[in-house]
């Protein structure tokens, strides 16, 4: 970018006005989006207005449309719901109402509208835009606006952000609020599990989703439910028989509870609703189980937004402002959405149309089509669910076709490791393999701490944090002889390694060892699982989302304490080794003033600039500061050094406190994202493994010595991909245990702009308008 273009971002909004409103049902994370729109709007030189109470405020005007300031969006990030209010508005559906809304906007010179809401709200916005010129000529004829005002506001730009807990909008992988709603549901499922086990009960849980089964489907994957009912895929006609057989089989195998998840819009093949009460009566009548119904209701909309939703809201808000200010009369109204982990712009009406097509397909009972239209991510969730829940576990048998696969954890514990182990073990058994589990990583493999795992061995593991198998950082090189002996002794034909940077390095060592030891010529795959998110070959690691949420919750509490004492700055040290992922993302999610990381070298002048920035901040109404520091960002500028510097420089203006978060970041129950991600990664790894073993089978034994027989399974942009460890070698900085290129570094400017730094907006995400049809035929997403 040239210097002129740098400058352009800061002046892009001069003379323009943006209005932001939230409409329809509220969703956690809407406040993060509002905050980002306001702050980035002000950063570009535009005036930004809040529209209170959704479209109703737009129609009523007056005090409902107020100018926003930088401070007016402070302390909003961690609040659920929408601070500027939302309402379902009948007036806006009538042309008369839209005429009044247009009048209110023209009088204030607002020609850019950012709408945060569901598909109904966004369709309304598009109608408003298409009528705009007619509305203006009507207002001019009625003498309500002058010709000059009409010319000045000749066209209206509209950008939509999808805020909906149902995740029912086509074209976006995740809508704002969905992840937080899953957090609420999983908290409740975890709580119910303990009481159900105590009494050997069956629970029927009803979750939201009138026309979309996303919440129900992901919940059932995340808690290992016995059955799920979703509107997109009604059960077969004899489902009652199947359900009861499934429940009694689970009990026979020693489980003390059954969980059935029902989406509120669940139907059978004929379109007749399936209710929770109906399911309860069926189970009681046929099986005589003690059965309870819990309807979760509006709990799912409430509570604190998750880290994912805060980051999603912030990223989408920044992109929305850019889309509005770059808009011309010819650009179509667009939706800013997420695909994989990339921000994309999609034509609003294309997305709305596909969303309507899903409803139509369901009404016409074309359920296969409805599933396809929901997108790849939804389909993959459904496939994994069907595998884990509906296929009967095989009776153990020793046949010639059976292969032996071992599963192990390596590195430091990370939440979600157990979910990955569970899904690899069960998918392996379903495919007719013998699955062994190795305790204590490569050390256990050398010592022979290996046992066979059956179906119920991993029962209830999905929601448990840490590593049940035990994990060590030891690398295999020192013990190749013992490891080779055990591979032969236990007849191990494939290895699934779940872990962090050590798992990846261990994989490279196994590759090297193949030259000396033929026994090591077996396929292996690494599933990245570490809080640091520093494994080459993957944008995300299992466990990082849980750690991020732990840091966020702590930062919220610390900010609350600082808000009470006033004029206080907190310096918080996060984990991550040399990788600044946790510090950066937690900085975005918690609204930090700065985040110091190794990947972005800083000097004493930068520290001084931050102190001066905080001195200025204390003069405003926001009298507190939050600074994050990655544990290894600089060997000399330690947490103590930064704390002492801030304490000295801030004397008389603010006082400082420091907090080292430590190992609490590795613990806790895994978040829905980590459970779901780990389950899908485990399933995909085991499928790959079965194929690879068959490929490598020669003359009665396994022999795999090609580079593609040792891979890392990672999420790259929009797809899950297997990459040979040897190919990833060049992309790795081994001294600092990080990948040479990291996607999240491009989000750092957003962090700085939202903290009011005068920087150049040159490296934020540049999303171009794509078409939804092209997106759907792309790579396999997860």
UniProtKB/Swiss-Prot annotation:
EC category: transferase
Locations listed in the record: Cytoplasm
NCBIfam families from the UniProt entry: 6PF1K_euk
Bilayer-spanning residue ranges: none
Protein keywords: Acetylation, Allosteric enzyme, ATP-binding, Cytoplasm, Glycolysis, Glycoprotein, Hydroxylation, Kinase, Magnesium, Metal-binding, Nucleotide-binding, Phosphoprotein, Transferase
N-acetylthreonine: residues carrying this PTM: 2
Residues at the catalytic site: 166 (proton acceptor)
Region C-terminal regulatory PFK domain 2, annotated ranges: 404-782
Activity regulation info: Allosterically activated by ADP, AMP, or fructose 2,6-bisphosphate, and allosterically inhibited by ATP or citrate.
Record region (Interdomain linker): 391-403
N6-(2-hydroxyisobutyryl)lysine found at: 559
Taxonomic path: Eukaryota, Metazoa, Chordata, Craniata, Vertebrata
Glycosylation site residues: 532
Record-listed substrate binding positions: 164-166, 201, 208-210, 264, 292, 298-301
Modified residues (Phosphoserine): 133, 377, 669, 777
Name of the gene encoding the protein in the UniProt record: PFKM
Pathway(s) the chain acts in: Carbohydrate degradation; glycolysis; D-glyceraldehyde 3-phosphate and glycerone phosphate from D-glucose: step 3/4
Name the UniProt record assigns to this protein: ATP-dependent 6-phosphofructokinase, muscle type
Record: residues binding beta-D-fructose 2,6-bisphosphate: 473, 530-534, 568, 575-577, 631, 657, 663-666, 737
Family, per entry: Belongs to the phosphofructokinase type A (PFKA) family. ATP-dependent PFK group I subfamily. Eukaryotic two domain clade 'E' sub-subfamily.
Entry binding sites for Mg(2+): 119
Tagged with keyword Transferase: yes
Free-text description of this protein's post-translational modifications in UniProt: GlcNAcylation decreases enzyme activity.
Binding-site residues for ATP, renumbered to this chain: 25, 88-89, 118-121
């Amino acid at each position: 970018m040239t210097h002129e273009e740098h400058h352009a971002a800061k002046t892009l909004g001069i003379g323009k006005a943006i209005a932001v409103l939230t409409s329809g049902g509220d969703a956690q994370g809407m406040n993060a989006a509002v905050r980002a729109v306001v702050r980035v709007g002000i950063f570009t030189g535009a005036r930004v207005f809040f529209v209170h109470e959704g479209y109703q405020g737009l129609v009523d005007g007056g005090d409902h449309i107020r100018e926003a300031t930088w401070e007016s969006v402070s302390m909003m990030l961690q609040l659920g719901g929408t601070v500027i209010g939302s309402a379902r508005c009948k007036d806006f559906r009538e042309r008369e109402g839209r005429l009044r809304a247009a009048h209110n906007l023209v009088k204030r010179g607002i020609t850019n509208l950012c709408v945060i809401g569901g598909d109904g709200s966004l369709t309304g916005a598009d109608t408003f835009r298409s009528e705009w010129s007619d509305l203006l000529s009507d207002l001019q004829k009625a003498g309500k606006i002058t010709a000059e005002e009409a010319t000045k506001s000749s066209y209206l730009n509209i950008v939509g952000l999808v805020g909906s807990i149902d995740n029912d909008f086509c074209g976006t992988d995740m809508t704002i609020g969905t992840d937080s709603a899953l957090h609420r549901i999983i908290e409740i499922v975890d709580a119910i599990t303990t009481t159900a086990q105590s009494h050997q009960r069956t629970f029927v849980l009803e979750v939201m989703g009138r026309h979309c089964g996303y919440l129900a489907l992901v919940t059932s994957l995340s808690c290992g439910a016995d059955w799920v009912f979703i509107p997109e895929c009604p059960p077969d006609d004899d489902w009652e028989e199947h359900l009861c057989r499934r429940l009694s089989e689970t009990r026979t195998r020693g489980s003390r509870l059954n969980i059935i998840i029902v989406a509120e819009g669940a139907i059978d093949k004929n379109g007749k609703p399936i209710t929770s009460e109906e399911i309860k009566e069926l189970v009681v009548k046929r099986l005589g189980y003690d059965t309870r119904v819990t309807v979760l209701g509006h709990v799912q909309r409430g509570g604190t937004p998750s880290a994912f939703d805060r980051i999603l809201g912030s990223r989408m808000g920044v992109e929305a402002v850019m889309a509005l200010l770059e808009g011309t009369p010819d650009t179509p109204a667009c939706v800013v959405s997420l695909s994989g982990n990339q921000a994309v712009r999609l034509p609003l009406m294309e997305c709305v149309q596909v969303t309507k097509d899903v409803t139509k397909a369901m009404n016409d009972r074309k359920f296969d089509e409805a599933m396809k239209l929901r997108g790849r991510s939804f389909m993959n969730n459904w496939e994994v669910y069907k595998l884990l829940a509906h296929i009967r576990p095989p009776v153990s048998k020793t046949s010639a076709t059976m292969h032996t696969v071992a599963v192990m954890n390596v590195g430091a514990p990370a939440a979600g490791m157990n979910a990955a182990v569970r899904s690899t073990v069960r998918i392996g058994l379903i495919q007719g393999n013998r699955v062994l589990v190795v305790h204590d990583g490569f050390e256990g493999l050398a010592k022979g701490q290996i046992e066979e795992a059956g179906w119920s061995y991993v029962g209830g593991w999905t929601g448990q944090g840490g590593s049940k198998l035990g994990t060590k950082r030891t690398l295999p090189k020192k013990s190749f002889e013992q490891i080779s002996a055990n591979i032969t002794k236990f007849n191990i034909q494939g290895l699934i390694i779940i872990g962090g940077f050590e798992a990846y390095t261990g994989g490279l060592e196994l590759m090297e060892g193949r030259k000396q030891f033929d026994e090591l010529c077996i396929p292996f795959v690494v599933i990245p699982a570490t809080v640091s998110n520093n494994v080459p070959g993957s944008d995300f690691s299992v466990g990082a989302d849980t750690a991020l949420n732990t840091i966020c919750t702590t930062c919220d509490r610390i900010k609350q304490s600082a808000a009470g004492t006033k004029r206080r700055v907190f310096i918080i040290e996060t984990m991550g080794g040399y990788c600044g992922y946790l510090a950066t993302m937690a900085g975005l999610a918690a609204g930090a003033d700065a985040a110091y990381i190794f990947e972005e070298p800083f000097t004493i002048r930068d520290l001084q600039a931050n102190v001066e920035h905080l001195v200025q901040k204390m003069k405003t109404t926001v009298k507190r500061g939050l600074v994050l520091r990655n544990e290894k960002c600089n060997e000399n500028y330690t947490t103590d050094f930064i704390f002492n510097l801030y304490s000295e420089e801030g004397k008389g203006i603010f006082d400082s406190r420091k907090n080292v978060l430590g190992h609490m970041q590795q613990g806790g129950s895994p978040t829905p994202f980590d459970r779901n991600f780990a389950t899908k990664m485990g399933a995909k790894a085991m499928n790959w493994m079965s194929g690879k073993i068959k490929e490598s089978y020669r003359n009665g034994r396994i022999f795999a010595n090609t580079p593609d027989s040792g891979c890392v399974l990672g999420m790259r942009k929009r797809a899950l991909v297997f990459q040979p460890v040897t190919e990833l070698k060049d992309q790795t900085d081994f001294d600092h245990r990080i990948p040479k290129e990291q996607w999240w570094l491009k989000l750092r400017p957003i962090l700085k702009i939202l903290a009011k730094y005068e920087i150049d907006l040159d490296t934020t995400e540049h999303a171009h308008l794509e078409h939804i049809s092209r997106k759907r035929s792309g790579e396999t997403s997860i």
